[in-house]
Amino acid sequence: MGLPWYRVHTVVLNDPGRLLSVHIMHTALVAGWAGSMALYELAVFDPSDPVLDPMWRQGMFVIPFMTRLGITNSWGGWSITGGTITNPGIWSYEGVAGAHIVFSGLCFLAAIWHWVYWDLEIFCDERTGKPSLDLPKIFGIHLFLSGVACFGFGAFHVTGLYGPGIWVSDPYGLTGKVQPVNPAWGAEGFDPFVPGGIASHHIAAGTLGILAGLFHLSVRPPQRLYKGLRMGNIETVLSSSIAAVFFAAFVVAGTMWYGSATTPIELFGPTRYQWDQGYFQQEIYRRVGAGLAENLSLSEAWSKIPEKLAFYDYIGNNPAKGGLFRAGSMDNGDGIAVGWLGHPVFRDKEGRELFVRRMPTFFETFPVVLVDGDGIVRADVPFRRAESKYSVEQVGVTVEFYGGELNGVSYSDPATVKKYARRAQLGEIFELDRATLKSDGVFRSSPRGWFTFGHASFALLFFFGHIWHGARTLFRDVFAGIDPDLDAQVEFGAFQKIGDPTTRRQAV
């Protein structure tokens, strides 16, 4: 037939059997990729330190999605929350991966069967004897079935009625675990950070889908609407399906980048806005203040800060710090976190506590500036020593650590003080192992960043696909050269282009 590469899908345009076949094969490829990717990630994943080397630091992409749906155990004897387990059951990470691969194989065989046996009676219109699909009826069936699945997920899986529940955590990503969730039917259900909204929205949307599906199965579309929206044309289905997909892709790009109950920070890493707003820093200072109010010493108060909370308050975990085209996991960038050194408190020779101004997200380098409690600059690391007035040496800055590995250690040597001041720009200070993975020291993004970029990019692409195929199906007659206002009798076959007398064929 000699079709160009971008027109090859026209071979299934009027062939319902093979149209079904290629869609089953597509499902086989998607499920096969998911299962294979899960097995690859499990082969390289190190579950030994869920606090300082969680899945998102290791660049895991499909493991977080399995985990948020209730999978936490491995046939390797480990649990995602740490520790060992003896009986993971069939629905472990490997079990889910295997199920996808088996399903992929079955879909592969089904696709081959439908490609060979394409001319089935079910696709034949008994009135004309030609292949045809009752698209409004198929729409009703699909809407009904997806509504049942949606309702079932919300009413059974999420609520724990028949299923594990979903991953639920506190606002600071410290206590996450899989647990049943009760539907939130009040206004709080519309808060994107309330897990109960996931249950209630799936129940509500599923109910609507079931009712809408039954409606479309029992009511035929009016003739004018059927013709106006080209409901008999398979390209209409393609166009509206693309619209549904690109809309969903834009939505999930937003929920991933800005954060929501569906994208817990324990599984996907923190968002950039938590660094921008000093979210974890404020909570750490609140906890320290509460400790001091209980008559704890500064050292004791800082020692009570969970290492997990301190690790979130580090710029290397900000997904916006990694360039889009820097391949590899976060661990391949700044290294594998080994331990928290503690919180550095800087003081000048007059005893004032100084705070290092933190690096904003979109800076690669930033001046080291130390300010007092009133925001007045008291010390810095100058660019030109000759003009300096606030250098560490001149001001006599010292640093003392509270909590962490260096608890109680203090330094007055200017070179050491400056080293820790530079590192304090990046948030809490951690010891990082760059040797094991030959990490290059250049920040990488987390799976949160990759997911957002991928889905926003494909959503834009699919938006244009929707416009393209929508225009093709609505204006098919115009593109074919048939003018709806043509009142002259057209002799088909007389012209190379229908209705265009300038292209009259020559008589042989």
UniProtKB/Swiss-Prot annotation:
Keywords: Chlorophyll, Chloroplast, Chromophore, Membrane, Photosynthesis, Photosystem II, Plastid, Thylakoid, Transmembrane, Transmembrane helix
Record GO cellular component, one term: photosystem II
Name the record gives this protein: Photosystem II CP47 reaction center protein
Record text on cofactor binding: Binds multiple chlorophylls. PSII binds additional chlorophylls, carotenoids and specific lipids.
Pfam family, one: PSII
Entry similarity comment: Belongs to the PsbB/PsbC family. PsbB subfamily.
InterPro entries assigned: PS_antenna-like (IPR000932), PS_II_antenna-like_sf (IPR036001), PSII_PsbB (IPR017486)
